[in-house]
């Protein structure tokens, strides 16, 4: 570098050093404009995490408590063994939850995917209102949705039971599926679909061999989201369930009406584990 500078004329050397000085000043000024990490941000982050997840950890720990009271007396699996292995009502509620969650999620995924593909592929009147209307069931309070479904079932003379719970879960899951699949379709390349049509593929062939494979990650995430929402729903299920249609959240609610026990902690721990997995 020194040899190169030595061969330059004085005014060029001065210009070179001036340019380096300007670049350094500009770099320092740009560094000041960049967002800096606020002091204590790590502490705030971990405090928020602690606030959100500390109750869950306490619940998980006390589900293994040997005593019925809040005092820790030792580690034990007794509450899992006694209740899970010797309670047919619990297994029936668990079975109802799983059946309704997976079958309702399948139907909601099918209907929501078809709606998303239809709005993405075709133009029709009031198309712009479809996405707006899909947000309404999501922003309405669950108690409003539950009461409206209860009034509807009573109006059409449909007896409350497993069928009404299944219809309700399918209904409130469709908007979530529609939005997730629509977001995936918006990211896909429309020229691939046009190329398939130009090569002679029919509408059904294009749907099942091009569109569905491109949207498959969104469809899978929508299905899992629907299953999770269905498994944990209580409010809507409370309004539309009938005899023989008790789900796991309803079963837990019926137990805590007589006081919280480690059995409730154990059931809640199982639901948390199922949701996470």
What is the predicted role of each segment?
Residues 33-37, 80-89, 230-277:
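Interhelical loop and adjacent transmembrane-helix boundary motif
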Residues 29-34, 102-134, 151:
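Transmembrane-helix boundary motif in ABC transporter permease subunits
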Residues 53-68, 96, 146-157, 224-229, ...:
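A structural signal for multi-pass alpha-helical bundles of membrane permease subunits
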Residues 89-99, 154-174, 216-218, 223, ...:
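Loop-to-helix entry region at the N-terminal start of transmembrane alpha-helices
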Residues 43, 50-56, 170, 178-181, ...:
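Transmembrane alpha-helices
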Residues 23-33, 69-70, 77, 126-127, ...:
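Membrane-interfacial helix termini and adjacent extracytoplasmic/periplasmic loops
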Residues 54-88, 238-243:
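Short membrane-interfacial helix/loop motifs at transmembrane-helix boundaries
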Residues 1-46, 277:
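Transmembrane alpha-helical segments of polytopic membrane transport and secretion proteins
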């Amino acid at each position: 570098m020194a040899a190169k500078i030595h061969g330059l004329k004085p005014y060029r050397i001065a210009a070179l050093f001036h340019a380096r000085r300007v670049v350094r000043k500009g770099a320092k000024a740009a560094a000041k404009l960049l967002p800096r990490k606020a002091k204590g941000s790590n502490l705030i982050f971990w405090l928020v995490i602690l606030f959100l997840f500390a109750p869950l950890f306490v619940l998980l720990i006390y589900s293994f408590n040997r005593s019925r009271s809040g005092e820790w007396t030792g580690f034990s699996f007794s509450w899992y063994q006694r209740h899970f292995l010797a309670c047919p009502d619990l297994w029936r509620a668990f079975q109802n939850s799983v059946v309704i969650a997976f079958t309702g999620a399948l139907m909601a995924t099918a209907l929501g995917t078809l709606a998303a593909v239809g709005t993405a592929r075709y133009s029709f009147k009031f198309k712009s209102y479809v996405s707006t209307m899909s947000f309404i069931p999501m922003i309405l309070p669950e108690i409003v949705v539950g009461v409206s479904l209860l009034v509807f079932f009573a109006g059409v003379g449909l007896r409350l039971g497993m069928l009404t719970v299944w219809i309700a879960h399918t209904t409130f899951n469709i908007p979530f599926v529609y939005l997730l699949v629509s977001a995936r379709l918006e990211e896909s390349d429309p020229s691939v679909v046009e190329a398939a049509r130009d090569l002679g593929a029919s509408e059904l062939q294009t749907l099942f061999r091009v569109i569905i494979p491109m949207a498959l990650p969104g469809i899978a995430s929508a299905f899992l989201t629907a299953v999770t929402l269905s498994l944990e729903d209580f409010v809507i299920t409370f309004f539309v369930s009938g005899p023989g249609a008790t789900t796991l959240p309803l079963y837990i609610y019926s137990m805590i009406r007589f006081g919280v026990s480690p059995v409730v902690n154990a059931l809640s721990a199982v639901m948390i584990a199922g949701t996470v997995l």
